[in-house]
Amino acid sequence: MINEVYQLIAPKLIDTAYKEIDLSKNEVILRPVKMSICKADQRYYQGLSNRAVLMKKLPMALIHECVAEVIYDPSGVFSVGEMLIPIPNTPTETDPVIAENYLRSSHFCSSGYDGFMRDYIQMPHDRLVKVPEGFDMRVASFSELVSVSVQSISRFEKFANSNRRKIGIWGDGNVGFITALMLHYLYPNAELYIFGTVEDKLNFFTFAKETFHVDAVPEGVSIDHAFECVGGPGSRPAINQMIDLIEPEGSISLMGVSENFVDINTRMVLEKGLNLFGSSRSGRKDFLRTMQIFAEHPEVGHYLENLIGDEFKVRDIPDIHKAFNADYMRNFGKTVIDWDK
């Protein structure tokens, strides 16, 4: 079976490659239905990542956020027509201590390995999770991003002390919104404080206790723990403001990606006995927990609909360029692709 794969071969240059699907494998064949563009995909497309690193990864198909329809399952575990979320992380080994998404040997779709921008996806059964019945497929398309927030919260539960009454989230973008929303449902008794820079975006956090512009935080505000969802050049002031406002022995979850080293106030980290930990990507456990949250709290999907920005029907390569170029101009929300191949 021949599969048409849409690969980025150079920044802003996409071409088709033809690869064979081995039907003798006991794996599921799916057809992508909806996709969502991630900032990492956008950096690759625009050529904004480190050029030497990018050239080692290309050519590759982009997109690691997707919902797909089952076309064929030789084992019969999944039914034809069933809607599933493919897990982009594929471990090649297991470790009793290190999670699958932190193993250096794991393969990740659209990061050196083909993403989901292809006619068909072939995946092992354990790399697929079911979408709850009746859930909005547009929101399901960016379930991977939600699972990244869930992964960070799971690590928070592992490292943070039991003082969890006041939690601060820095960042008023997509990751900040999703992380705050997940905390709202997983810790309904916690007070959530959002720190951002754009009032219009802060207004979306209707479930939070309070929102603050980072340049106008009142005296006396303090938090037990913090999540950094800023990244880029904003990481430095965000992390240092967290260090200033956090209570002793609090934990800080670092989620934002920065291309440059970030200077932080280590003196106060030591003086307060703070715990800083990183979080990246996600694994099967995080996807399952995400789907459980979707199933138990259907209103989460309605909140996440606020993130849906442009929607593009993609039939050919020019449509792909149109979707990526429009997404590049957005500063909030997710671009959803209707894969109509």
Locations of regions flagged by a protein language model:
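C-terminal hydrophobic helical "lid"/dimerization subdomain
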Residues: N3, R284-K341
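NAD(P)H dinucleotide-binding glycine-rich loop of Rossmann-like/cofactor-binding domains
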Residues: T90-K166
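Mid-domain Rossmann-like dinucleotide-binding core that forms the NAD(H)/NADP(H) cofactor-binding site
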Residues: F135-A216
